[in-house]
Structure formats: C-alpha cells, structure tokens
Amino acid sequence: MSKRLYVAYGSNLNIQQMTSRCPGARLYGTGVIENFELQFKGQSHGAYATIAPKDGASVPVAVWEISKRNEQALDRYEGYPSHYFKQDVPVQLDGKEVTAMVYVMNLKMDFGLPAPYYYDVVREGYEDCGLDPAALEQALRESTAQFYGSHWPHQESIFRFESDAEPDEDELEEDDDPDLDEDEPELDETDPFYFSEGMHL
C-alpha cells in the first residue's frame, strides 16, 4: 500500500486524535514550514486552524506517514475540496527538507475565534509533539485582533470560565426572552461556508 507524507499543524498534532482518525498512521517527524503563518478562520466563534503565506514567518508542524485510506478519511474530516484544498509544501525536518501534503482553508473564509475545547486539543497536540507553543499563542492573539479589531484582553475573557461568576441582569433578561432565537437561521450543510464538527487540522 502506497504511503504519503501529511503535514499537521492544528488538532491533528494531537496523537490520540490522529491515531483514532487514521489507524496505522506513523509520526514521521516534527519540523517547520517556512514563509507561512498559523491562523484561525471559519465560523466566528468556532474557527479552525489554517495556514497562509507570510514572508519570514514559520509554522511548527508534525509530519505523518499516512495510507491512501487515511488520506480519504482526512478528506472527509477536513471538508475537502469545498472547505479545504490540498497542496504540497516543503518541510524543514530534522536538518533535511521533505515535501508533504497539507490542507489549507478556503481563502474566502474570515478570521474567527476557536472554541475553547478545540484550542485545548491543539495545545495538547503541541505538547505531544514537543513543539514551541509561541506560534499557537501568536495565532490566537492575531486572529482575535483581526476578528475584533482590538487585542488580547477580549480573548482572555472568552477563555475564562468561572463557575461562581454571576451574569448581569441584561444577560439574564436576554436569556429569558424566547423570541430572541426566532430569527436565527438553521445551518445548511450544503452551504460551502458550513463547517462540520469533524474539521480539525
């Protein structure tokens, strides 16, 4: 069975997740892709990781050796070709350069905020692979700034969960109003901007 090298930069850095999705996949090594930056894009409050060209930047990655069946599974998870496209990129890996396939999000997508659970899965993947989390933290800050037009304090509030915190009266009144959700549109899975919950790079 033919094998292919695949670049993970998001939640598929997480070894438990990747081995569950792609049985038999082997961690080939870790390294960087140069002249790209990590970003969070897609849904406004459920964004996923992607990469974009940027001179002088670099993204820490893991390279997996996958089978054709594994690649087909990843295609489904990543919404290929409508949500992500594939391209080959050079990877600097343990003092040598290899070429590997990477998924890149549809360039029409806007910046957004990752869900806390998804961000934690990615962060755990960085730990699994022994990668420096600085690029991940920078991607979160910059994507937040792009989304809000401001800076880090907004994101800190989103990721702070205090069980004893009391909502203010305005929030309680909004939550108690059954009419607020009447005009909320239903998700259409045929829409090219719809993201399935399986998408985790």
Specify the residue positions occupied by each region the protein language model found:
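Glycine-aromatic micro-motifs
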Residues: M1-L201
